[in-house]
Regions:
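Glycine-enriched, solvent-exposed interface loops adjoining structured elements
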Residues: 1-217
Length: 217
């Protein structure tokens, strides 16, 4: 699925396919709508944007931070070429081993979520030089060029098209149909599964990311 394919389908739905009159929106404007739609999809269904990667943490630092295009750390699995890294609660670690932040660097055996910043996490012990860790995180894609292949599965194409139509009609003051725009946005949400059966990535009171199902009340 490319932005161009999405734009072509969206133009038909907004009667902007250049068949009878000049296009109301340029390809650049439509591409902007596509990239906005992807970012909205990431907010509604962050689980569709989980990345598995091996990364090099900052040496000799217990507190780590992922890049700015990452919205949250999901899991720290293991040291690459080494053992598993188990998740523990930071408050529990602080109570049971008050000096854990000053211990000698080495291969991490535990990790903890930051209580207030989903992009940050802690490693125990602090990683030594040459350490790589296997992690999962949610990353919002950079803006796509019109011919790029998007990372979202093609089965979600109709959802992105619906959101592009919504965004186009919402800014077209001359011909906007508010109810029609709302219908396309509702279709976008439903196509993503953002209804009563949606599986959301949420935070528990402990700060740990979890998945749960919505209910009818």
């Amino acid at each position: 699925m490319t932005p161009q394919e999405v734009i072509t389908q969206a133009r038909v739905l907004i009667n902007d396919d250049n068949s009878l009159m000049p296009e109301r929106f340029s390809d650049t404007e439509m591409l902007g709508f596509v990239n906005q739609a992807i970012k909205r999809a990431a907010m509604v269904r962050p689980d569709l944007f989980i990345i598995s990667d091996d990364i090099t943490p900052t040496v000799d630092q217990v507190e780590q931070e992922l890049s700015t295009n990452v919205t949250r750390i999901m899991e720290v699995h293991r040291v690459v070429g080494g053992g598993a890294i188990g998740e523990v609660d930071k408050e529990t670690m602080d109570r049971s081993a008050p000096n854990w932040t000053t211990e000698t660097s080495g291969a991490p055996v535990n990790w903890m979520r930051h209580p207030r910043n989903p992009r940050r996490y802690f490693l125990y012990p602090a990683p030594s030089t040459g350490t790589e860790i296997s992690v999962e995180y949610i990353e919002v894609p950079d803006d796509y060029a019109i011919g790029d292949t998007m990372g979202l599965a093609d089965s979600y194409r109709s959802a992105i098209v619906d959101c592009v139509v919504y965004l186009a009609e919402a800014v077209d003051n001359e011909s906007v149909d508010t109810e029609r725009a709302k219908q396309f946005y509702t279709s976008f949400l439903q196509s993503l599964g953002a209804d009563m059966t949606q599986r959301d990535v949420v935070d528990s009171e402990s700060g740990k990311a979890e998945q749960r199902r919505g209910n009818n009340g």
